[in-house]
Amino acid sequence: MIQVLLVTICLAVFPYQGSSIILESGNVDDYEVVYPRRVSALPKGAVQPKYEDAMQYEFKVNGEAVVLHLEKNKGLFSEDYSETHYSPDGREITTYPSVEDHCYYHGRIHNDADSTASISACDGLKGYFKLQGETYLIEPLKLPDSEAHAVYKYENIEKEDEAPKMCGVTQNWESDESIKKASQLNLTPLQQRFLQRYVKLAIVVDYRMYIKYNRDSNKITVRAHEMVNHVNEMYKPLNITITLSLLQIWSQNDLITVQPASSITLRLFGNWRKTVLLNQQNHDNAQLLTDIVFNGRTIGKAPVAGMCQPDRSVGVVRDYSSNVFVVAVIMTHELGHNLGMEHDEDKNEKKCKCDTCIMAPAISDPPAQLFSDCSKNDYQLFLTVYNPQCILNAPLRTDTVSTPVSGNEFLEAGEECDCGSPENPCCDAATCKLRPGAQCAEGLCCDQCRFKKKRTICRRARGDNPDDRCTGQSADCPRNGLYG
């Protein structure tokens, strides 16, 4: 595989002396100040893209040197990504901005197998990384003529309200006996290697949130992009790519009645999505970001197992924290409900309680970044029972020939498979080529690295359409029964 470009940033670390400081993410009472210095590995005179496909940062945390590897999140935007706002006279204004050369990255810490990172490099470095089991945040200090950044732990952010923040979901979709029985099965590690799924996401911002950010559409847009980048990172272990399809800002007034009763707001938003938003642009799921204070301690709500249903593939999320990472965890949680996941509680004689997992009923401190085994079981059960069709197909994207980057969710020039993790049994992470003896790495007609037999049903009949069956020569599931 062609050697990717590496950029090294040297960070000098200075301990802060004094009390707290007010950052964009809130008041922080303990942090380190770092000054990035960029050193490029490109030959002198070479043309640099604004944002490289791959970067490497070296810095110290608590006196220990770390190496942060970053790769651009090329699956962040759909090819038809749009942004919509409204003029003072109520006219809908939609644009299709160029987002190919964006500045949002995912990554990991060298020699830390459990590490993750989600970083924006748009204006300095902003985001989070997980190091040795602890979550750190980084953001620019916004000092005049300075490259200073702050690195700090989530627990060092001063909390205005210590009361637990709750998800408003209470229903259980596992109703009939066959589903109950299936829900008690535990997945093997092999079964937890989920096939790739894709969710084209629409984000709608209500008028209260527009006012909250001083009517600054650009600030809201950046916040939404950072949020989806974080959500995308948290869904990687489930092999789900969250792609932002559209962003709509209700910049004049709300198009539904947003009210403190979260259940009513959710129902109204679902009906609006079904009758209005789906007619504007294709997408799989819509999330309403609002600044309203819901009744009780509710900060989010979504229909369980609603994915791909016109009025139920929705969620409502309160933008209650200045820290975008926290709100991203809430959105990840509500999307989990749409994908069939219930709260991590003791249920059906299963021990599912996990206070530090994404699907816990209350947001943890620090916010969770991992799904429990029970959540993975719920998701697999949802796929089996509902067979949601809308998340099978990869979103349209611009086909560019670029340096192959493993694990970016898409096949690129020179890749036979998107390898991602070195533990992938079918795909060599070093070369992005199939391992010896492997015919495939993923797909509806791929099973344990081999093509499924000819005429194996890979997609059940829908309406007048017949069953789709494997050809025996490809990992893809052909449409309309064309199996040869």
Curated annotation (Swiss-Prot):
Protein's UniProt keywords contain Protease: yes
Q: EC number(s) on record? A: 3.4.24.-
Motif Cell attachment site, residue numbers: 462-464
Keywords, ordered alphabetically: Cell adhesion impairing toxin, Disulfide bond, Glycoprotein, Hemostasis impairing toxin, Hydrolase, Metal-binding, Metalloprotease, Platelet aggregation inhibiting toxin, Protease, Secreted, Signal, Toxin, Zinc, Zymogen
Where do glycans attach? Answer: 239
Task: Tell me the active site.
Answer: 334
GO-annotated molecular function: metal ion binding; metalloendopeptidase activity; toxin activity
Q: Which residues form the propeptide?
A: 21-190, 396-413
Expression by tissue, per the entry, reads: Expressed by the venom gland.
User: InterPro entries, from UniProt?
Assistant: Disintegrin_CS (IPR018358), Disintegrin_dom (IPR001762), Disintegrin_dom_sf (IPR036436), MetalloPept_cat_dom_sf (IPR024079), Peptidase_M12B (IPR001590), Peptidase_M12B_N (IPR002870), Reprolysin_adamalysin (IPR034027)
Subunit note: Monomer.
Designated name of the protein: Zinc metalloproteinase/disintegrin PMMP-2
Q: Which organism is it from?
A: Protobothrops mucrosquamatus (Taiwan habu)
